């Protein structure tokens, strides 16, 4: 199996492609956008979840995806997370002036979820909450954890997701992705009080 990742960096937006024997993905991302998105993935529920990251994170996303969904959606979701995470890490550059940390507690009907992130360059992922099982159309619910883990790994991000309580599986998913968008928005934002300094006593972030 061949893997290729092509990245084009500029301060405003990033275009990236990933092509393997299982998937082909084209992505354009602007971390400092207005929450505009356009998806063509053939996986409707996945698009629905990604739209929440975009809208609530004010991250512009343009995603085209073709994968081996005749088998299942695993490769498509996993490879999208790899590409998105890599793109986030690359676009942040040296991370000068950003807040670095972000957290948000979000309610959706009976569900309460907290998401916390640290963009300091050290990977960790922890999910606490109800087991994610079942299907939404062709999308297996447990793929959301695969997406979050691979996103955090490739963005070199510390990501904690805590679903305090809630029963409706759709609401649980929405609360996670919306809160993630909100937390990323906080972490990526420029902190005017730091005058563009690196947000670490080490003076450098990977």
From Swiss-Prot:
Q: What class of enzyme is it?
A: lyase
Reaction(s) this enzyme catalyzes, per UniProt = D-erythro-1-(imidazol-4-yl)glycerol 3-phosphate = 3-(imidazol-4-yl)-2-oxopropyl phosphate + H2O
What are the BP-aspect GO terms?
A: L-histidine biosynthetic process
EC no.?
Answer: 4.2.1.19
Keywords of this protein's UniProt record, alphabetized?
Amino-acid biosynthesis, Cytoplasm, Histidine biosynthesis, Lyase
Q: Where would you find the membrane-spanning parts of this chain?
A: none
Q: Which GO terms describe its cellular component?
A: cytoplasm
- Top-rank taxon of the source lineage equals Bacteria
What CDD domains does the entry give?
IGPD
Official protein name in the record:
Imidazoleglycerol-phosphate dehydratase
Extent of the signal sequence: none
Phylogenetic lineage: Bacteria, Pseudomonadati, Spirochaetota, Spirochaetia, Leptospirales
Specify the pathway. Answer: Amino-acid biosynthesis; L-histidine biosynthesis; L-histidine from 5-phospho-alpha-D-ribose 1-diphosphate: step 6/9
The record's section on InterPro entries has:
IGPD_sf (IPR038494), ImidazoleglycerolP_deHydtase (IPR000807), ImidazoleglycerP_deHydtase_CS (IPR020565), Ribosomal_Su5_D2-typ_SF (IPR020568)
Q: Which gene encodes it?
A: hisB
Family in the record: Belongs to the imidazoleglycerol-phosphate dehydratase family.
UniProt xrefs under NCBIfam families? PRK00951.2-4 (NF002114)
Query: Which organism is this entry from?
Result: Leptospira borgpetersenii serovar Hardjo-bovis (strain JB197)
Intracellular or extracellular location(s): Cytoplasm
Q: Does the keyword DNA damage apply?
A: no
- Gene Ontology molecular functions: imidazoleglycerol-phosphate dehydratase activity
Q: Is Lyase one of the keywords?
A: yes
């Amino acid at each position: 199996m061949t893997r290729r990742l092509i990245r084009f960096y500029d301060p405003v937006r990033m275009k990236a492609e990933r092509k393997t024997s299982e998937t082909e993905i084209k992505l354009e991302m602007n971390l400092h956008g207005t929450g505009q998105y356009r998806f063509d993935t053939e996986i409707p529920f996945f698009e629905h979840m990604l739209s929440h990251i975009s809208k609530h994170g004010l991250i512009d996303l343009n995603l085209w995806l073709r994968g081996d969904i005749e088998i299942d959606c695993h490769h498509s979701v996993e490879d999208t997370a790899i590409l998105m995470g890599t793109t986030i890490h690359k676009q942040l550059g040296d991370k000068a002036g950003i807040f670095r940390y972000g957290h948000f507690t979000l309610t959706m009907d009976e569900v309460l979820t907290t998401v916390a992130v640290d963009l300091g360059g050290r990977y960790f992922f922890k999910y606490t909450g109800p087991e994610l099982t079942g299907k939404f159309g062709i999308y297996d619910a447990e793929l959301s954890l695969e997406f979050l883990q691979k996103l955090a790994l490739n963005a070199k991000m510390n990501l904690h997701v805590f679903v305090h309580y809630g029963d409706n599986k759709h609401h649980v998913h929405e609360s996670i992705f919306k809160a993630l968008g909100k937390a990323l928005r906080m972490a990526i934002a420029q902190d005017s009080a730091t005058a563009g300094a690196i947000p670490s006593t080490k003076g450098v972030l990977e």
